[in-house]
């Protein structure tokens, strides 16, 4: 990657983290940063070690773990905060990442 491409990849990361609860599609993102879709996908994975939406999912799950361990939010509130349309999608994603349900995670915290 050249400096300009790297700058655009970093911008892409900033954009998806800023709008994590309503992220743009890959096509929208590539248009917004003015970088080809293929270059975006390859460059992002090369720079951050994982595909765009895996990076975003990991970010959301880490954020979920922080919010849940704070004890101020219940599972449904965290689900809404992270932009999930329903809590069952959130619970499934959380369990896939951490191996336990959010409720079990809260009890262990």
Language-model-derived ranges and their functions:
Residues 1-8, 18-22, 31-34:
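Membrane-proximal linker segments that couple transmembrane helices to downstream signaling/catalytic modules
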Residues 10-18, 23-28, 46-85, 107-109:
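Terminal helix-turn-helix DNA-binding modules in bacterial transcription factors
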Residues 69, 91-109:
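…primarily DNA-binding HTH/wHTH and HhH modules…
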């Amino acid at each position: 990657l050249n400096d300009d491409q790297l700058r655009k990849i970093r911008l892409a990361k900033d954009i998806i983290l800023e709008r994590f609860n309503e992220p743009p599609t890959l096509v929208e993102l590539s248009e917004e940063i003015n970088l080809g879709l293929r270059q975006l996908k390859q460059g992002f994975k090369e720079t951050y070690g994982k595909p765009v939406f895996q990076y975003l999912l990991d970010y959301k799950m880490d954020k979920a773990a922080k919010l849940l361990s704070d004890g101020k939010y219940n599972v449904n509130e965290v689900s809404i905060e992270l932009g999930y349309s329903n809590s069952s999608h959130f619970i499934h994603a959380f369990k896939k990442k951490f191996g336990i349900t959010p409720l079990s995670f809260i009890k262990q915290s």
